[in-house]
Amino acid sequence: MKGDTRHLNGEEDAGGREDSILVNGACSDQSSDSPPILEAIRTPEIRGRRSSSRLSKREVSSLLSYTQDLTGDGDGEDGDGSDTPVMPKLFRETRTRSESPAVRTRNNNSVSSRERHRPSPRSTRGRQGRNHVDESPVEFPATRSLRRRATASAGTPWPSPPSSYLTIDLTDDTEDTHGTPQSSSTPYARLAQDSQQGGMESPQVEADSGDGDSSEYQDGKEFGIGDLVWGKIKGFSWWPAMVVSWKATSKRQAMSGMRWVQWFGDGKFSEVSADKLVALGLFSQHFNLATFNKLVSYRKAMYHALEKARVRAGKTFPSSPGDSLEDQLKPMLEWAHGGFKPTGIEGLKPNNTQPVVNKSKVRRAGSRKLESRKYENKTRRRTADDSATSDYCPAPKRLKTNCYNNGKDRGDEDQSREQMASDVANNKSSLEDGCLSCGRKNPVSFHPLFEGGLCQTCRDRFLELFYMYDDDGYQSYCTVCCEGRELLLCSNTSCCRCFCVECLEVLVGTGTAAEAKLQEPWSCYMCLPQRCHGVLRRRKDWNVRLQAFFTSDTGLEYEAPKLYPAIPAARRRPIRVLSLFDGIATGYLVLKELGIKVGKYVASEVCEESIAVGTVKHEGNIKYVNDVRNITKKNIEEWGPFDLVIGGSPCNDLSNVNPARKGLYEGTGRLFFEFYHLLNYSRPKEGDDRPFFWMFENVVAMKVGDKRDISRFLECNPVMIDAIKVSAAHRARYFWGNLPGMNRPVIASKNDKLELQDCLEYNRIAKLKKVQTITTKSNSIKQGKNQLFPVVMNGKEDVLWCTELERIFGFPVHYTDVSNMGRGARQKLLGRSWSVPVIRHLFAPLKDYFACE
């Protein structure tokens, strides 16, 4: 099959709903109070074509920033600091192979994440799952038919937020003659304590016929007041809701063919076409297992919906006071999947009464101090955080100024990307005058790869997600806009770029995406020799611009670090090092390779395998002091003084790749502060002018807010260095510090192995020059959209051997071959380590300050 496409699921959980008021067909600029969440899931793959469900652009950057709260609601299933998201034990899925050899399934929870079950994007345009029922009255959206890491048991649409200025279209690409829908949400944010104290509260809906109107919803359509339904609006996933009277919403009456619904979980209201509602009784066809596994908000919404159904059906379930949310949900879900027996769907119907919000059991957002959110004013979409505020009653909507607008009216700035492209094509404006990602005027930064700018929102998203890669090694999002719902993957095995259909259609030309799907192989616009394609024009100096883009994200300006003059050779002495989160002693290895004498090397490390490597390979010259959290100021004074403090705290709870991450202030993220206070303990006392250096490392794909907080504490901005410049593998990392010349260009030495073939053993042939980022996961070894083995030996494909992995990272051969460790354990050690050539580049200037051998 030709074509290399990746479908991104545009489904957004109902928690991601955006407020929109349609006036003469235009969407008013509604502010948003709740940030969106990023949930990336992968879907089945057809040979030559890949699909994945992604969030859309403006939600993605803020989305990831709140997973800390998403997983911190006390459910306990998410967040233990592991490098992979922890799924609930309730529904673990197993991978199933497709009957067709051209179709592969990949499931997030399965043993192998490289296989996906996916119907052909050309043969089916609807969302499909194993339990899809043709008789369902709802037509699934066409453009987001497939999901990343889709589950094999049910149609499981995944969140993919639309743009910040979205007009919610409820038609699902079908004709809708009932007018334009209106969605109403409440401006509120969640306090941190709400996630703990709010429990499973939600706005209580009770029967109150006095608030109803006997003539309401008399349009011949299904569903009346009080009916429990699944709600569907274009761009968002199925979410449980209850049909309510317009009087409960403090809004106008619904238009003919429309219904006001209140969403379970956060109590927001939306006006939805009756044709986009399905009875809650059709549970198995619309229950989203992938979303259930990922989102606390979805699980809570399920609990509230099934609790209401249970009460109506007179059903009881055994429970005990200590039961968790999952313990309570398990029998409920079994009951729902079993058809709500014994009463069935009939038992879920209301008693012809009008449900309204019980004012005595809810609190208005204005009744308590709201936690400020960076994206609070930018998008109004439900997130997992909102579920914790489910006991708030929706208050009247109010307009709020965009947080990046500096108080100006943005009416003159807003324009569509189509309009921008048209103006550029007609020489009415310049590409640099608009955001290449969304079209907004007056960008605040340049696009690093293509001519054009980036607005503040798109710039932050680009900073967070550009270096985020999937398990197959490709970028998680479009190279142009860092979002996209359907992505086309470059066929060049050494290229990791992908481009979304929207960017191709708007910037290159209408019909370009369709043509690209038919091309095999297809080369992306970073690989093609010509620079210009429509209004998409690759910069001549894109590689320099890319480096400058990440290093120019200053956020705040800090004083330049103190510069120490070089020490005369006769006065230089051995270096004394404190290494926190030492790993496999990369710092010590590099210092010895540079010929710098090491007077003492005190290392904090808790991994026994890492300690074994450092002890054996460096013959006991490293003093290990165990857990960094147990080191005191007195210890530093006893072990010191130190000339160099280095470290890189675990990235599990900082990396955007981990949907269950907790952020900088929870989980392993807070270990950064251990580095911070030990660094301060190690600094020379006032009046001591001896040279003192330090360096802190972490991932690039982190939340912009976390990055800037780290910079604020360390009082400097990071430099970004990708190991691809000095090795055979991608590995982009941020480095903070005061090492001399940290921001100088990275130049490979003659001994650096820049291509994979240079790293292989005898009689082994590399199938590509460079490999993607190697992580602790075994599937990171395979390359490309087809998950190819990178090596051929005696005519057979093979994975990389441990010795070859060591060469790629710059370590000596057999460096990790200690303590009878197996291949998997050795790869985990390497996957958490630093790239030796990069650290050598950073440490090289220290030769002017310390004695050398």
Swiss-Prot record:
Binding positions for S-adenosyl-L-methionine per the UniProt entry: D582, G583, I584, A585, T586, E605, D627, V628, R629, R832, S833, W834
PWWP domain: residues covered: 225-283
Activity regulation note: Activated by binding to the regulatory factor DNMT3L.
Alphabetized Gene3D superfamilies for the sequence: 2.30.30.140, PWWP, helical domain (1.10.720.50), Vaccinia Virus protein VP39 (3.40.50.150)
Covalent link Glycyl lysine isopeptide (Lys-Gly) (interchain with G-Cter in SUMO2), residues: K89, K617
Keyword Zinc-finger: yes
Positions of region (Disordered): 1-218, 341-423
Tissue occurrence: Ubiquitous; highly expressed in fetal liver, heart, kidney, placenta, and at lower levels in spleen, colon, brain, liver, small intestine, lung, peripheral blood mononuclear cells, and skeletal muscle. Isoform 1 is expressed in all tissues except brain, skeletal muscle and PBMC, 3 is ubiquitous, 4 is expressed in all tissues except brain, skeletal muscle, lung and prostate and 5 is detectable only in testis and at very low level in brain and prostate.
Paired cysteines (S-S): none
Domain SAM-dependent MTase C5-type stretches: 575-853
Annotated region (Interaction with DNMT1 and DNMT3A), positions in chain: 1-298
SMART domains: PWWP
SUPFAM superfamilies tied to this protein: FYVE/PHD zinc finger, S-adenosyl-L-methionine-dependent methyltransferases, Tudor/PWWP/MBT
Region spans: Interaction with the PRC2/EED-EZH2 complex: 435-527
Catalytic activity: a 2'-deoxycytidine in DNA + S-adenosyl-L-methionine = a 5-methyl-2'-deoxycytidine in DNA + S-adenosyl-L-homocysteine + H(+)
Record-linked InterPro entries: ADD, C5_DNA_meth_AS, C5_MeTfrase, DNMT3_ADD_GATA1-like, DNMT3_ADD_PHD, DNMT3B_ADD, PWWP_dom, SAM-dependent_MTases_sf
Biased composition (Polar residues): 179-199
Consequence the record notes for mutating V836M: In ICF1; uncertain significance
Residues annotated as the enzyme's active site: C651
Acidic residues bias spans: 72-81
Cellular component aspect of the GO annotation: catalytic complex; nucleoplasm; nucleus
N-terminal signal peptide: none
In-chain residues carrying the UniProt-annotated modification Citrulline: R410
Domain notes per entry: The PWWP domain is essential for targeting to pericentric heterochromatin.
Function as written in the Swiss-Prot or TrEMBL entry: Required for genome-wide de novo methylation and is essential for the establishment of DNA methylation patterns during development. DNA methylation is coordinated with methylation of histones. May preferentially methylates nucleosomal DNA within the nucleosome core region. May function as transcriptional co-repressor by associating with CBX4 and independently of DNA methylation. Seems to be involved in gene silencing.
Stated name of the protein: DNA (cytosine-5)-methyltransferase 3B
Organism of provenance: Homo sapiens
Gene: DNMT3B
